[in-house]
Amino acid sequence: MAGHSKWANIKRQKARVDAKKAQVFARLSRAMIVAARQGLPDPAANFQLRTAIEKAKAAGIPNDNIERAIAKGAGTLSGDGRQFESVRYEGYGPSGIAILIEALTDNRNRTAANLRAAFSKQGGNLGETGCVSWMFRQRGVVQLTGAIAEADLLEALLDLPAESYDLDESGAIVYCSIADLEALSTQLRQLGYPVEDSELRWIPNDYQLVTDGEQARSLLRLLDTLETLEDVCSVTANLELPPELVTALEATL
């Protein structure tokens, strides 16, 4: 993790700002809808749903809203005739940065039009299905916060279903297979590690370094715009920036 700032870490730096935005409730609600749609609507039997509910409660979302989101995902919400579907979109930003977007929508045409407009405004373009997805793979991600002793973490991970990890002064990110996410998160908690988040995440196979300030600014504006669109659940890019450039751009993020 040392040396350059990858998009996953840039997102973490932006989290405090993003958390203040009104879209946070909608984003967390969509996460619950997706989790309930993809698995059982019972959080005790659905790790992703349970995690999404924990995040929603931590953000102060009322229980009624949580129950409504679960019912919507399960298709049992009365009076709501909309049919939602999970859709993946792909495109390129400035400097040829690959961008993968997951959305939950009841109108593909509306979502695609909004995404296309966002890409065009910042010099990117929405691509065809498959144009960049081969550059990413989905993995389980457990995020730890606070000062983590690398030697102790490495020793602990030798006995856990972890594949790799990144570490810096703010915490650690531990990666695993999709199937091992729940077990890894649970076992790290049991060992006393401060687990902040557990989720499935698309991880770039390789990162593309951008050193031009204007290109980087346009990319960050594009990614921020995409993340605030109503139907968007997640945005992933293979972007890597030098830390000094991130520092210079922090005021504009």
UniProtKB/Swiss-Prot annotation:
Subcellular location(s) per record: Cytoplasm
Domain of life the protein comes from: Bacteria
Pfam family, one: Transcrip_reg
A single BP term in Gene Ontology: regulation of DNA-templated transcription
Signal sequence extent: none
Molecular-function GO term, any one: DNA binding
Gene3D superfamilies (alphabetical): 1.10.10.200, 3.30.70.980
InterPro entries in alphabetical order: Integrase-like_N, TACO1_YebC-like_2nd/3rd_dom, TACO1_YebC_N, Transcrip_reg_TACO1-like, Transcrip_reg_TACO1-like_dom3, YebC-like
Tagged with keyword DNA-binding: yes
A single Gene Ontology CC term: cytosol
Similarity comment: Belongs to the TACO1 family.
PANTHER family: TRANSCRIPTIONAL REGULATORY PROTEIN YEBC-RELATED, TRANSLATIONAL ACTIVATOR OF CYTOCHROME C OXIDASE 1
Record NCBIfam families: PRK00110.1 (NF001030), PRK12378.1 (NF009044), YebC/PmpR family DNA-binding transcriptional regulator (TIGR01033)
Protein name per the record: Probable transcriptional regulatory protein Synpcc7942_1017
The species this protein was found in: Synechococcus elongatus (strain ATCC 33912 / PCC 7942 / FACHB-805) (Anacystis nidulans R2)
